[in-house]
From Swiss-Prot:
It comes from Salinibacter ruber (strain DSM 13855 / M31). Keywords: Ribonucleoprotein, Ribosomal protein, RNA-binding, rRNA-binding. This is Large ribosomal subunit protein uL4. The gene is rplD. Belongs to the universal ribosomal protein uL4 family. One of the primary rRNA binding proteins, this protein initially binds near the 5'-end of the 23S rRNA. It is important during the early stages of 50S assembly. It makes multiple contacts with different domains of the 23S rRNA in the assembled 50S subunit and ribosome. Forms part of the polypeptide exit tunnel.
């Protein structure tokens, strides 16, 4: 599968880039995608929810009234979970929600997400570019020339491009990240995945192999 390579000014360069079928044209594995999305979202949870249980609520521990002779149901102290102001029974406790997948599963999830995008012609390739200073107007003009304005855009850069990143901060529908940082959720959330040539090379090199390299 070949796609046009665009220049920094949004004009076709006349060259094409090949999308490796082992990365961009596989049978997507929906279950692995779900597992990876669940993993990513679990890592984003703070897990700091906390409620006071019976032994932590402030107050006296004395028995409210004698056991027998009042005609009322027997009770203990005021911290009982069944009383107003008492402790919470089985309340929330701080916990770690994180869980992990192995490297092959993470790569398969990203390949599956990229294959969905490629199947719908939602992957574009642009030459590597940098900015001397933040330029939001220039970035929006580029997206208009590429015909992707108004869509949720994931721009994967070959390297850390601080000025390009800063240029996107006032654009709520644009996500600029170095290619090594993008994950399955980033890909799925985007309507269009815009890859710099170097980013495409990195994805092809890393996701097309099962060797132990950073992913």
């Amino acid at each position: 599968m070949d796609v046009e390579i665009y220049q920094e000014d949004g004009v076709e360069s006349g060259e094409t880039a090949a999308l490796d079928p082992t990365v961009f044209d596989i049978e997507p594995n929906d279950h692995i995608i779900w597992l990876d999305v669940k993993r990513i979202q679990a890592h984003q949870r703070q897990g700091t929810s906390k409620t006071k249980e019976r032994g932590e609520v402030r107050g006296s521990g004395r028995k409210l009234y004698r056991q027998k002779g009042t005609g009322n149901a027997r009770v203990g102290d005021a911290q009982s979970p069944i009383r107003r102001g008492g402790g919470r029974a089985h309340g929330a406790r701080p916990r770690d929600y994180a869980h992990d997948l192995n490297q092959k599963e993470k790569r398969l999830a990203r390949r599956s997400a990229l294959s969905y995008k490629a199947a719908n012609d939602n992957i574009q390739v642009i030459e590597n570019f940098s900015l001397d200073r933040p330029d939001t107007r220039g970035l929006t003009d580029l997206f208009e020339l590429l015909g992707v304005e108004g869509q949720d855009i994931l721009l994967a850069t070959a390297e850390v491009e601080r000025e390009v990143y800063l240029s996107s901060q006032n654009l709520p529908d644009v996500n600029v990240q170095e290619v090594q940082s993008i994950n399955t959720v980033d890909i799925l959330d985007a309507d269009v995945v815009l890859l710099q040539e170097g980013a495409l090379d990195w994805l092809t090199d890393v996701l097309s192999t099962d060797e132990a390299v950073p992913a």
